[in-house]
Curated annotation (Swiss-Prot):
Residues 68-77, 130-159, 231-409, 464-517 are cytoplasmic. It comes from Caenorhabditis elegans. The keyword Cell membrane applies. It holds the Pfam family 7tm_1. The gene is dop-4. The chain crosses the membrane at residues 47-67, 78-98, 109-129, 160-180, 210-230, 410-430, 443-463. This is Dopamine receptor 4.
Length: 517
């Protein structure tokens, strides 16, 4: 029999389902031993909850498809995002639908005690895997920011897959064996089959909260704190147009390396690298222009000195081929004039003067075009040798810039996870140690649980909003577009020189000038 009414203890409309009965000799005989009534809450609640489930499943499936099908997303961070999306899919496919039915039935469990244990185990598995995946992602971002050049050597596909496997093994150990613990430590929770209550064992709640949330949360905050410090230092260097380099000092037979801040002394080496079309306030760079292939303008290092001896082959095509720039002597400020472009084929450019030695070596890159008014200036003294594979370093710097752009999106994902799950992992231990502290414990538990579940729906929305690569991938998948090759502004071998971050200054186009000031 169905009856519609209003629960006196709740504001929601409900539908009451009662078992069929028969009357014999003024005696009521129930046809089943199930609970006498199931209160179904308002249908709009069901529509809302199952819409959340559908969005969660669809969004995370889209993330998995995007990373698997788009080459530009298949990187170590992309594999971690797939692992995170799988954890969110578990929430959307198993945990959220069962919890939705539990809410719609007005907190009446319909699936039996065994499925209640499976429900809690899958919930713990997914939430633990999510935060540990985010922890690995944050450590990955920290390593990429600390050592962008050596990052690709340290973080391989095999190591990332091993880290992902470790995350899931840890999550499974914490969740499914916990069923035995729950039944042993909390047998009173299994007396009523219409209820699905989580264990109140203080030891398990404390241990699981520590491993599932607080330890990875500490590692995440530590890693992103370091990332923030590194990014702040680099952004300051970019605004100043200065890059810190390592200085090697030799005292007799012993040699030690010291890294010093360029901003602290005028006698320390300063490297400025500029490209773009914006105006430069400095008069020494105003008329400088460097053409690298077709689209990138790069103003290379400037070195002021008295004399320049170039032992190179001069051609009439006014180009510079594969320069090997080597300054062997530092010098005082003076001007260098050039009336035409020159061609150096694997030769040295020797800067001679009476100052302390300065050495700069760049391995031979591809063909470039150097305009007649371009300058190369590096302040003296600099006593170090840097041998760089410029093509490879340029590619690595392109990846680094791309990864740093992705780091912002991932930091938002981490922030959303912390905001969504912190209430649950604060409330659950409190209720285990102080049952009388909350008068409406069931309502609060429902709220904090669904706040955590909503995080699984938010992640794909964050990707589509803050990640240009994911937004493009989602658009291509949903509209059945073929992947188009993306043009990049960093295609020249010397587009990014000298590792890590550089000073970027834009300059307006100026007519060629035959002299350098």
């Amino acid at each position: 029999m169905l009856a519609y009414g209003s629960d006196p203890n709740a504001e929601d409309l409900y539908i009451t389902m009662t078992p069929s009965v028969s009357t014999e000799n003024d005696t009521t005989v129930w046809a089943t031993e199930e609970p006498a009534a199931i209160v179904w809450r308002h249908p709009l609640l069901a529509i809302a909850l199952f819409s959340i489930c559908l969005l969660t499943v669809a969004g995370n499936c889209l993330v998995v498809i995007a990373v698997c099908t788009k080459k530009y997303l298949r990187n170590p961070t992309g594999y971690l995002i797939i692992s995170l999306a799988i954890a969110d899919l578990i929430v959307g496919v198993i945990v959220m639908p069962m919890n939705s039915l539990f809410e719609i039935a007005n907190h009446t469990w319909l699936f039996g005690l065994m499925m209640c244990d499976v429900f809690h185990a899958m919930d713990i598995l997914a939430s633990t895997a999510s935060i540990w995946n985010l922890c690995v992602i944050s450590l990955d971002r920290y390593m990429a920011g600390q050592d962008p050049i050596g990052y690709r050597d340290k973080v391989s596909k095999r190591r990332i897959l091993m880290a992902i496997l470790s995350v899931w093994v840890l999550s499974a150990i914490l969740s499914f064996p916990g069923i035995i613990w729950w039944r042993t430590s909390s047998p009173h929770l299994y007396e009523d089959q219409s209820q699905c209550l989580f264990t109140d064992s203080k030891m398990y709640v404390s241990f699981s909260s520590l491993v599932s949330f607080y330890i990875p949360l500490f590692l995440i905050l530590f890693a992103y704190g370091k990332v923030y410090i590194i990014a702040t230092r680099h952004s300051k260097g970019m605004r100043m147009g200065i890059k810190t380099v390592s200085i090697k000092k030799r005292n007799g037979k012993k040699s030690n390396t010291e890294t010093e801040s360029i901003l602290s002394s005028e006698n320390e080496p300063t490297l400025r690298i500029h490209f773009g079309r914006g105006k430069q306030s400095s008069s020494s760079l105003r008329n400088s222009r460097f053409h690298a292939r077709e689209s990138t303008r790069l103003l290379l290092k400037q070195v002021s000195c008295k004399s320049l001896n170039d032992r190179g082959e001069h051609n009439n095509n006014n180009t510079v081929r594969q320069p090997l720039l080597r300054g062997t002597e530092g010098c005082h400020s003076d001007s260098i004039s050039r009336s035409s472009q020159r061609n150096f084929r694997g030769r040295n450019v020797t800067i001679g003067s009476n100052c302390s030695s300065t050495l700069l070596q760049v391995d031979q890159p591809d063909r470039m075009s150097l305009s007649s008014n371009s300058q190369m200036v590096m302040t003296s003294p600099l006593s170090t040798r840097r041998k760089l594979n410029v093509r490879e370093k340029s590619r690595q710097m392109m990846r680094y810039v791309h990864e740093q752009r992705a780091a912002r999106t991932l930091s938002i994902v981490v922030g959303a996870f912390i905001l969504c799950w912190t209430p649950f992992f604060v409330f659950t231990p409190l209720t285990a140690f102080c049952e009388s502290c909350f008068s409406n414990k069931e309502t609060i538990f429902t709220f904090v649980t669904w706040a955590g579940h909503l995080n699984s729906m938010l992640n794909p929305l964050i990707y589509s909003r803050f990640s240009r690569d994911f937004r493009r991938a989602f658009k291509q998948i949903l509209t059945c577009q073929r992947q188009q090759k993306v043009k990049t502004a960093f295609k020249t071998p010397l587009s990014l020189v000298f590792t890590q971050l550089i000073s970027v200054t834009q300059m307006w186009e100026q007519p060629p000038n035959t002299s350098i000031e």
